[in-house]
Amino acid sequence: MQIKKNIAISESGYIFNPSSGESFSINPTGVEIFNFIKEGKTYEEIEQLVLEKYNTDKDTFDKDYHDFIGFLKQYHLLDYGEKEN
Amino acid sequence: MEKQRYERPVIKKLETNMPNKYGLRTEYRPMTHIDGVEVTQLIQDHGSPLFVISEQTIRRVYREAKKAFATRYPKVQFAWSYKTNYLDAVCHVFHQEGSWAEVVSGFEYDKAIRNGVDGSKIIFNGPDKTEMDLEKAIKNESLIHMDHLDELYSVIELATKLNKKPKVAIRVNMDTGIYPMWDRFGFNYENGQAWDALNKIMRSEKLELIGLHCHIGTFMLSASAYSAAAYKLADLALGVKKKYNHDIKYIDMGGGFASKNTLKGSYLPGSDVNPTFDDFAEAITSALINSNFEPDNLPLLILETGRALIDEAGYLLGTVISNKRSSLGKRTTIVDIGVNILFTSFWYDHKVTPAQPFTQYTEDTTIYGPLCMNIDVIRDSISLPLMNKGDHFVIHHVGAYNMTQWMQFITLRPKVVMIDANSNVHVIRKGETIDRITEFEAIPKHLEGFEL
């Protein structure tokens, strides 16, 4: 699972999909996770990074992460290539 | 190093020119304190959910209302509408401010007496007054506002029996140009019922006709309707003066003033568009002053407004139980406040403010209560800042009707606390316990014991 290569994201969380013309806004936690996925980090790595930085727990993060990924899928921002997991 | 506050990741598609029912973000700052007391501390000490009443706010709003009328009219008296919130502590604040009591049942009447209100300063409204209630009211020289002819005949009979001259008024209903017209209470002005009742009272010579009363509706968004009502009551009062040379001592305009809540379906927030006390006062007092009363012999103006005086002083604190998605992907948040304690969520889009810091990101959300019932919806559609499980929030303007119309249903009713001017917290109603509920029940002998 990867972020599609042509998707652009700004530091403030503005996302543009040039192939569809759609744009999105994500919050700072979303930007971090989005970039982690873009960098090819695994779920376990992302989880560890988030738990180190934020005052939350595994269960909450697990639920929120999959909810977030669900929306990235729905908005066609993900690419399922060789690295699909 | 201290960890940062977690906010769940969210992504929102940016769409232009797409109006929706969720509206825009309304919350910009968390409500961490109420009258100097920390919200999280209140919940820690008294549990969640928790009703909080601000004594200062009651007094401030009451004084604003009083000022709006007293600066326009020489004789003004407020009477606290017990049904709106009859917690004793709340009633005491209003009585300390000078309000009489306005009650609509024997239960409320007894509550006012127990609170120490002099019988002659209790206005007794409503269609259901038992003979026992009426006898008590007559003996205490309370102001009996009659709703129907059966009651009028009962009062005449009791006057003879007790050899007393009860102080009475009639409730008048009328067309004030609003919809729906409330015509179920009292005697109609336009079709002559009101005059019929007044003639019966005056001809009986057993009753002292002391006032005229109306209550034209609820959550009135038009002040001008009160002007029409005041003119019609003035017309009746002047007619009685002309016909029987009898002075009507007071005109009671009832209540029904809108509070600052936002009605469901309203495009703009109630705090911006609902009429103010000045608007209502201007409409009512102008009508009375411009009618043909002699300037030095104006009747006392009584007001029974409840909702507009107490709504703002009431807060309901709660906690997030869970964040979910609906089948269509819509965000839903479950909280520990149900419609059984927030009855007014059927009428209003209540303002909800998180009690801890949040960012500018929101999600279009439906807020559900904790009851296992489909009707338990606190907000259908709200652009809500992101809150985590266990976070607290404050629901605003819940002071009217929720603490009288609430139900013990599925769960127990919570505590009510009042914060005084010095930020001291007082429990004014204890939380319910299972023993308190079951002490009213009994199990017949043959139902005792079973095997499963």
Which residues does each PLM region occupy?
Chain A
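Acidic, low-complexity/disordered tracts enriched in E/D and polar residues
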Residues: 1-31, 35, 81
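Long, charge-rich, low-complexity alpha-helical segments
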Residues: 25-85
